[in-house]
Amino acid sequence: MATVAEQWVLVEMVQALYEAPAYHLILEGILILWIIRLVFSKTYKLQERSDLTAKEKEELIEEWQPEPLVPPVSKNHPALNYNIVSGPPTHNIVVNGKECVNFASFNFLGLLANPRVKATAFSSLKKYGVGTCGPRGFYGTFDVHLDLEERLAKFMKTEEAIIYSYGFSTIASAIPAYSKRGDIIFVDSAACFAIQKGLQASRSDIKLFKHNDVADLERLLKEQEIEDQKNPRKARVTRRFIVVEGLYMNTGTICPLPELVKLKYKYKARIFLEESLSFGVLGEHGRGVTEHYGISIDDIDLISANMENALASVGGFCCGRSFVVDHQRLSGQGYCFSASLPPLLAAAAIEALNIMEENPDIFAVLKKKCQNIHKSLQGVSGLKVVGESLSPALHLQLEESTGSREKDVKLLQAIVDQCMDKGIALTQARYLDKEEKCLPPPSIRVVVTVEQTEEELQRAASTIREAAQAVLL
């Protein structure tokens, strides 16, 4: 039976060959010949070799110009013209040998040179030494780390907290710990560089909405909702995150958190709140933007902040529910693979928290000074104030750009230099121009601290006004 079947198949093939159109047979024949040629032909052809004479070799060597090891850099680049600070960057700072009032460092609560903080750090140094020489999971966890995490969780009124040894890596590690490829992140276009690096590491689908524009965010959420309805199976495994800052580093503006919380529950998203600038600043007790708006901490899925501003230490922390925070102990890259925070800095942060809890009036003092400098800087010729009146970090931008970013930077730097000559230390906001997703305009950053007196605030405002008139008019 098998032989008969094989003969029948052969007969059908021959019959099909006779019935096939001529062009079909020609095409198949060409393809067969092409395949045979590809199989037996060589992948390359040997070219006739032509040896160069010694004279020709020497001429080629003399003509050859090597590429520079590094790209050419302008002599006016800020990295090549840095200021040298002598001593701690406290209320009064010595820059290039000249003593100035510090309006550049983020020492909001003036704790950097606080005697209690320094004494605690010295005591911890004698007990633990300088560093830990290992990550938290490899003999890098000291009792003072656990104490600090407990204190931070208690202060923020959350279940648990986790600390990182570097402020920048905190949010940059937290985002990719939860959001992976295939997930969707809705992020404010003015997000700081640390958030941008976290987004990049997550490999998630990033959707930017206009700065503090709740309507634009809802538009994106609605579009995603429509997409989810088309593919409900995929939607069930896709996580959605909203990433914002409490006070934006690049603009000094506050996020509309109440409206964001409403959108969170309406569209079933999770909120990550970066509070490096608002922690220790906003709220009656310095707990940040949630306390400022009176929003329950449970409405926020994860809060992140660094300890390098208000706490005048180093590192950062995340806080929230225990099951959320514990996930970072296994998935937070900066937590798992970096040496843990030096114990002396953890002890200093604990003492800074003690001072914040003992002196809650300090936040009202800072708020008043922020409002005063914000008001005093209004109407400066050629400059506009960008930022909320309650933000301790304001931006001064040119009212009208020259059309060239390089020229704008030079004009603002001339104002900074004149202020420095008159004893007011300021700085321009610096960015990695080629790596920023949405590059902010050039600006001068003015930082307010509780240590600055009213007379110094007014002096700074008048000095900036005079420098702007001299440079821009």
UniProtKB/Swiss-Prot annotation:
UniProt family annotation: Belongs to the class-II pyridoxal-phosphate-dependent aminotransferase family.
Subunit (UniProt): Component of the serine palmitoyltransferase (SPT) complex, which is also composed of SPTLC2 or SPTLC3 and SPTSSA or SPTSSB. The heterodimer with SPTLC2 or SPTLC3 forms the catalytic core of the enzyme, while SPTSSA or SPTSSB subunits determine substrate specificity. SPT also interacts with ORMDL proteins, especially ORMDL3, which negatively regulate SPT activity in the presence of ceramides. Forms dimers of heterodimers with SPTLC2. Interacts with RTN4 (isoform B).
Keyword Transmembrane in annotation: yes
Domain of life: Eukaryota
EC number: 2.3.1.50
Chief location category: endoplasmic reticulum
UniProt catalytic activity: L-serine + hexadecanoyl-CoA + H(+) = 3-oxosphinganine + CO2 + CoA; octadecanoyl-CoA + L-serine + H(+) = 3-oxoeicosasphinganine + CO2 + CoA; tetradecanoyl-CoA + L-serine + H(+) = 3-oxohexadecasphinganine + CO2 + CoA; dodecanoyl-CoA + L-serine + H(+) = 3-oxotetradecasphinganine + CO2 + CoA
The protein's name: Serine palmitoyltransferase 1
